Amino acid sequence: PPVPATPESKQQSPNNSACLTKRVNTFLQTHYDFRYNRLTEETEFRPLSGTKTEFRPIGKRELNTLCMEAHAEGISCWDKDVSRYIYSTQIGEYHPFRLYMDELPPWDGIDRLTPLARRVSALPLWVKGFHTWMLGLAAQWEGKTGVHANSLAPILISAEQGRMKSTFCKSLMPKVLQRYYMDNLKLTSEGQAERLLSEMGLINLDEFDKYAESKMPLLKNLMQMSSLHVCKAYQRNFRDLPRIASFIGTSNRSDLMSDPTGSRRFFCVEVEKPINCEGIEHEQIFAQLKAELADGCPYWFDKETEHEIQQNNAPFYRTCPAEEVFLSCFRTTASVEEKYLRLSAADIYKELKKRNAAALRGFNPNHFAQVLIKMGVERKHTEYGNVYLVVRR
């Protein structure tokens, strides 16, 4: 009986093996365009016959298809012969965000950042702050952040549904980078969150109010990171990777901020009407950002602007019962005719406890001192300890 044919790679001489490798490589190179994605660590491909076709990752199904197509061309090979080339350093590598920024057309000189910001709000501080935030986002995509991470997150707020907040956040991403947008960040693992900072371009903290207060220190720490020490999935070794992702957020609640000193990491803006998310000219918007970064425009917030943002966030603070009792009994500003009382935290605590003991449940004088500091009550240090300047109502 006839002996069944076997692939050429089975039990062959070194010369035949080299010949097969050459035939397989030539077939792949003449039919497909390949590239290695440094972010996802995947090889991507598209047919050479249609360069407009988008690249897509090679999985097991695609690998088997390539092997079958080689068989149809008379090349008797195994899938390992195909994968040997596909997963080799002969495939050129690229970084999706660097490539996007490198291939942008020249900026035409028309400011598109201001109209884009005004789609959300015409508040001057917002227009200015959104522009700086977008510069920070673009700087991280270009890998130019240095010591300045994009450590602020705009939070789009509206009590009513249907204002297109989440849609606007997603529409900031160019189409070719949409896969690097996410809106379901889980703050359960710091290592996992750090890995996402090195792989995503924009992370939407959608429904920002769902994140527990206990998670805020972790989130703020992530937002300040400019470089990352990451161990990727299925790997044992940690690597230092640049941060790519910036943060943005949405909420239907206005009582979001609980810590005025930490609120400089967020920029709350009220969305008063549905946001127009159509016709965003991504190429020219990012070309403008690229040109401004090249001209040395600052992509971080200075102390003065951070202070303005904290003042802007004041209406979005969430007050605890202890703060409410304090404000019902004392003021922190005095008129010309009035004099400040100089009271210790213990003195104020005792007086408030007489007024409303339930509101101070769980507090002691030391804990209450932290509340006064958080509220920004002016403090003076004396030889007898700290006193707070207040006016009794």
How would you label these PLM feature ranges?
Residues P1-I110, S121-K128, K354, A358-A359, ...:
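N-terminal nucleic-acid engagement/recognition segments and initiation subdomains in replication
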Residues E278-N313:
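Long, low-complexity, charged/polar intrinsically disordered regions in eukaryotic proteins
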